[in-house]
Amino acid sequence: MVNNFRIYKNFNLSKKDKEAIILIGNFDGLHRGHQKLFNKAKSFKKKFKLRIGVITFDPIPKMFFKKLHNYRLSNFDQKIQLFKKNYVDFIVNQKFDIKFSKISCFDFIKKILFNKIKPKYIFVSDNFRFGYKRAGDIKLLKSLEKDYGYKIINPSPLKSKRFVISSTLIRKNLEMGNLKKVKKFSVSYTHLRAHETQRY
């Protein structure tokens, strides 16, 4: 558990939170795929003596574009507790709106990641997309590593049989009432059950 955990609402970080290990994603309903990512980040934290930060978005971009309700698996307070348990030092909870959605993938890398965050390592999953019209991906991030001084870390996805463990997979199983599978995939099963009850 981390002491002095900090929550930012924009990318203006304090000096001590720059040049950190950065994880980018929604991290909705912490599952075992997320846990694999956090475990890897924790090993980097110990090895390189760096802080861990998470960049996440509110609302989840898919909720914003498709005007979805009752989509989240975790509320904000639940996310914070799960981050703290995984030795995250700070988060950037960026408001996702029309203005932010118009930022190009190149501007996101240069003006936000490079100019403001200055990460040493960026942890992302295979399906990560960013920038206007989701034009940016992990391939683009990797191609600009040397230009902007970061290193992309992309752990292989965790699978259950042929399925990648993801928030989408958990949602589908919740909708079908497959609670045994939800419990198997999820790190935050208690949170999910409590939150699911509140949704209906």
Range-by-range predicted roles:
Residues 63-126, 130-148:
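N-terminal Rossmann-like or analogous alpha/beta NTP/dinucleotide-binding catalytic cores
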Residues 147-158:
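A short, charged helix-loop
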Residues 11-75:
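N-terminal catalytic cores of NTP/NDP-binding nucleotidyl/phosphoryl-transfer enzymes
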Residues 190-197:
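Conserved small/polar residues in nucleotide/adenosyl-binding loops
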Residues 31, 122, 182:
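Divalent metal-coordination and catalytic microenvironments
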Residues 174-181:
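Short helix-adjacent coil turns
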Residues 165-170:
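Extended, well-folded interaction surfaces typified by the phenylalanyl-tRNA synthetase beta subunit core
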Residues 4-11:
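Short acidic-hydrophobic, aromatic-tinged amphipathic segments that line or gate anion-handling sites
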